[in-house]
Amino acid sequence: MKLKELLSEDTDVVSGVIIYSKDKILLCLRTNDGDWSIPKGHVQVNETPVKGAVRELAEETKIYIPESELELVSFGMRTKSDGTPGLLYLYKHEAAGQYVPTLDHEHEAWGYFTVGNYPKPLDKILKGVIWWIFVLNIV
């Protein structure tokens, strides 16, 4: 086990927020893999998934949305980069207007995109979830 893993307060749970306004979704371009995705990241030890989503959103974009304004829309298994399983929680937030993020080092660009008209490459898990939520209205 690496020292970073021993000192880490992160869990195998990832949590994120889908911010949408009218028919557009906020996406950020990740610097590590070049995929477009929503602000999301690892939940820390002794942190609930929704608290992790709020924290990650604030850290990555400087946008603060209270827990009470987030709705859980997806929960499921994910495959981590090392091939082992983890959990993924996704929340959505309907904004009255479009927030302007201030990005951290994890992202290099951002934009609001119409559902179905995404930049490429789009995070593969996210594409399916957006389809369920906004096109099929399952959630």
What are these regions, as identified by a protein language model?
Residues 11, 36, 111:
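Residues that recognize and position ribonucleotide moieties
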Residues 14-15, 33, 86, 108:
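A conserved catalytic-core signature of glycosyltransferases
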Residues 5-25, 73-75:
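Conserved N-terminal beta-strand and adjoining loop/helix that marks the start
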Residues 27, 88, 133:
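Flexible, surface-exposed loop/gating regions in the mature catalytic domains
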Residues 43-69, 74-129:
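Unchanged
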Residues 127-139:
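Charged phosphate-binding loop/patch that engages nucleotide di/tri-phosphates or the phosphate backbone
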Residues 1-9, 138-139:
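Short, Lys/Arg-enriched, disordered terminal segments
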Residues 20-60:
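Conserved Nudix-box catalytic region and its N-terminal flanking loop in Nudix hydrolases
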